[in-house]
């Protein structure tokens, strides 16, 4: 957390800072500098000694970073050759030397999941940045004197800022401007020629600010690749994305739903590990769908597997805590968080695992059930771009909060920058479901190599909130239906103009959200829903269960 203001109120800062101590329970530090206050909660993952504690300092400048920098050893080697010395094994210690050498150009050099704030002592200014996907959280707002404040979560800022917004992924903040340094959806081989895509772009940012950036026109070249070449590259790049995320000084585990995405991550990791990996799954006591398939995968890959069961009572009693934790009112995000939160809570309480690999971001790249209804490859690509841009408000937010509130770290192999860039560059005509099976390219990429049972590799997609047990979503709906009368629903929902609640369930979530984040609804652009402009997708529930092509997904 960073309060960028001379004479900032230290007590007000500490009050907000303490809201997220669970993100880093190992050690906390607050320092006051000439131009503000910087605070850091540490969860030790790389470099477990006290020397890895932040903020890191260099010639009066400071940096705090929540992140993992992959391949940092090579960057560190180059910096040592330039004369820099290091006191810890932390990957984040390289950031200030990188900034000194390359300025804000450093952010485009990073293969990382990160959110950071740098204080430049020479210029007496603050620079903030966030990874291109938004896997690591970062929020900002302004106090009563228009001073900017940065923090990992919105709850840090509620007592300081009147309006809070998510920091845009792939941007850095400098001198009052948000500048795009990398947009993962700008792939000229899909959207047009390199000449069309190169050059400056400008969009309206949050708070009405102008966000500018450039694109170098690099062509990925995937338009001319045949299907087998594409699938080989998908295979190789995902394997690399998993492998680099296995590096940790803390114990690593895996969330396993038994669906395609998490199962692939686990299967790849099992092949790359010299001992059985540790996998974890959760489901309702009454009708868990995932547990059966997760056990099948665990047996196949030989993992050390743990099953957790949850009850209706646990779900309902956790609802308010989950919404406060998430900082959202979005229906599908909250539903899917119930099981994930309870699973991660059990992992924290019952094991020594501190890093979890998950299967998020595959859907945004390869398609949901509803994208089977895309009217054209171009529409599919446009929808994928939208989902990638908004990931930080939905699935990625869910994974981060459910995991970090339990003092664990999330790593997302499908969010590997090289992998995302490559898949976004594949001709969308090859990605749309013309094969009779969604996500065909991903499935076909791993048909050889004995990664998974064929039944799992070809299993129909089921949303996590459905697959932990249909009864969980039904229980939440039933609870909300009994919470309000029809008249109360009509009256209470009428007061909202942004993202207006349209069911009693959505109203219940919004009312709880407002209790902890009053007036901050615009942090979330809208409810996550299928594209209602497409035939077959004009539905009023985000669950794939309401789609006509759901088929065997829930079996």
Kindly label every feature range from the protein language model.
Residues 41, 89, 181, 282, ...:
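Conserved beta-strand termini and adjacent loop/short-helix elements that scaffold enzyme active sites
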Residues 1-64, 68, 97-202, 210-225, ...:
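N-terminal glutamine amidotransferase
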Residues 5-12, 81, 101, 122-127, ...:
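ATP-dependent adenylate-handling active sites, centered on carboxylate activation for C-N bond formation
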Residues 82-89:
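Short, flexible active-site-proximal loops enriched in glycine and acidic residues
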Residues 92-96:
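Short, conserved phosphate-binding/catalytic loop or strand-edge motifs used
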Residues 75-78:
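Short active-site loop/helix that positions an aromatic residue
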Residues 453-462:
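Conserved S-adenosyl-L-methionine
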